[in-house]
Amino acid sequence: MRPDRFWLKSDEIGEEFTVVGNFLRNASEFLALRRNTSLLLVALLLAGTGEKLWLGFAPKYIETIGGSVFIIGLFDALQTLLGAVYAYPGGWLTDRWGQRRALLAFSAVAVAGYLLVLAWPHWLALLLGSFLFLAWSALSLPTTFTVVATSLERHRHTMGIGIQSLVRRVPMMLGPLVGGWLLTRFGWTDGVKYALALCIIMSLLTAAFQWFISEPPDKTLETDLNENVPVFSISFSGVVKSFTPALRELLVSDILIRFCERIPYAFVILWAIDHGGLTAQQFGYLVAFEMVTAMLCYIPVAHLADKYGRRPFVLATFVFFTLFPVTLLWARDFAWLALAFVVRGLKEFGEPARKALIIGEAAPELRARTYGAYYLIRDCTVATGSFLGAWLWSISPQANFIGAAICGGLGTIWFWWFIYRKR
């Protein structure tokens, strides 16, 4: 038998490599993948998986080790508040230090927080440690937006953020599944310890990939567009004054929508386990349903939003935010809770488009600080929603869900009236 029936000839091998190379180039172009964005995606995957191994179970863990409903609400409020407070300094440090150095510093601070919670199994350790371990997700948010903005063309921003959002959801799906198995297998106390140990290892791997992120050519920009005012002398109020009218209206509607999300956020796991009779592992399945739903939306919606406009998709995502607490009212078993979490996944339908709107409205020389200021104002305001949620939950779970839905409806109407109609 002829040998060439088993092996390709050299010219045929070259053609095969050409076809594969063209496919990979086309795929990377469609998905808006560049060196920095690709390295960032790996970092987000590793850091996010480590965090989600245990953080989503923290409210039940606090309850297990003796924390009250108020402590659960306080911990949830700290997540929101620190996410807000850290956003602006995260943007400032990114503008000042550059993307790589800032990300490495944020990872180091987060690891210190994980070590504290691992060494001291007490609800107070979670409250104190949150000031440290939330550094990655909170401080790095403006940095991740800046990486997209500096690496991609303007008309590719939604796809860049969409891919980033897609990758962020992989840990949100895998983390609770693995974490739920650890908690079911080893119990709440030991299970959280094992999850934290894995989290620390993955955070160290994250830093290794961040080391290779390169700085964009305009990193050393020191003055604003009129070349008279040093960029770093611009105050927080000056950054806020630079907000366009569209960005301000988006901020108001976003605040109302985040109240809708925050009010029931910490208590959904209590509803599922205490009222729905689910195990920790079954709750992990619910989160997986949510993440799969969100992931299926990101790429096609990002492509359509870049092509046809972002505002209709933002309006749709606000509607799904509002529907989630409504569906929880009837969700008292696994099947109905699964449906509710699919609706929760659909709330990510237009999130990349919303973030791309922020990118589009931000001045390039103030980009990271604009993101930080936006999230500082939004999340500082919304942090009170955790206490409101705890108070409503103490009345009844139904009061909590209805209050959330009212906020969502108001936010959706605001966006439609002030932004969507004016496109």
For each of these PLM feature ranges, what is it?
Residues 60, 64, 174-193, 270, ...:
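Transmembrane alpha-helix termini and helix-breaking/packing motifs in multi-pass membrane transporters
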Residues 74-91, 288-300:
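Central cavity-lining transmembrane alpha-helices of secondary-active solute carriers
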Residues 85-121, 305-311:
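Conserved MFS/SLC helix-loop-helix module at the cytosolic interface between two early adjacent transmembrane helices
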Residues 22-82, 246-286:
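Helix-loop boundary and gating motifs at the non-cytosolic
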Residues 200-223, 414-419:
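C-terminal membrane-cytosol helix-exit motif in multi-pass small-molecule transporters
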Residues 131-168, 357:
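Cytoplasmic helix-loop-helix junction between adjacent transmembrane helices
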Residues 108-122, 319-332:
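C-terminal ends and interior cores of transmembrane alpha-helices
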Residues 7-34, 216-253:
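Juxtamembrane intracellular "pre-TM" segments in multi-pass secondary transporters
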